[in-house]
Amino acid sequence: MSQEIIKVKNFSVRMGRKKVLDKVNIDFKKGESVVIAGRNGSGKSTFLRCLADVILPDQGQIDFYNGITKEKIGFISDQLSLFEGYTVQQGIDFHSSVFAIKDFDYTLVDELKLDKNQKIKSLSMGQRTLFQLSLLLSQRPEILLVDEIIHSIDPYLREKFLEAVIDLMGDSQTTVIMVNHTFSEIEKIPERVLVMEKGRFILDERAENLGGKIKKIESDSKVSGEIPCILKKETEFHKEYFIYPFSKELEKKFPYEYKTLNLNDMIKAFVGGQYVKERNN
């Protein structure tokens, strides 16, 4: 069994009067790849920033095991500064001096054909993202946090980014936690899928099990209230119900047509649907 590397206990964050995270309890294991989905404002990016120690809690704590220090946690976000006035090489030199990196890995920089004398502020969003990743990989992180950024970069650089992340997971057993709302391009990454709503995780499943545990019913009328419906989309003439957890016993008792969804369709539903039932951690 994989070693527990992060434990979040009774974690709450308020911003003004709004409770953004509400008594979150969850843990992550070494080498695990996790994707967090949820609607805008659900708390997923705040949660990632808490793991990165960018935001402090009003209640609760996060414990890191296996001797992990801040230097071994990499955080990628489009809101982070990247030494705007520096050239690419100056940024590398500064980062290397701060983290005592003796042998910087130029693989990604060279693959991108970046001019090392080019100002960082003149790089495209995709180039900046890959450059930031190259800086973090040079730290040999044990935890990599990626905050909803890859959907904004072009397909070629997105593929480069994902290849680098997959290599990192395989070579170093790095724990990767990504926040994302588009899953079509990253279905090969997550082992575990979390869905957050109103500051709490309402779904936590292995990606390989999701297809068997979540089904969809399409109907012209409402389904039985005994069916465990986690979200629904309803119009006057058409209704869609997302059933979780699904079981063969449920199918026998309520013989509707239960449709299987792929991971991308599931996440689209969670991001855009109207929740009718919330699940505690």
Q: How should each PLM-predicted stretch be described?
A:
Residues 37-39:
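The feature captures the beta-strand-to-loop junction immediately N-terminal to the Walker
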Residues 60-71:
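Conserved ABC transporter NBD signature motif
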Residues 79-131:
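ABC-family P-loop ATPase nucleotide-binding domains
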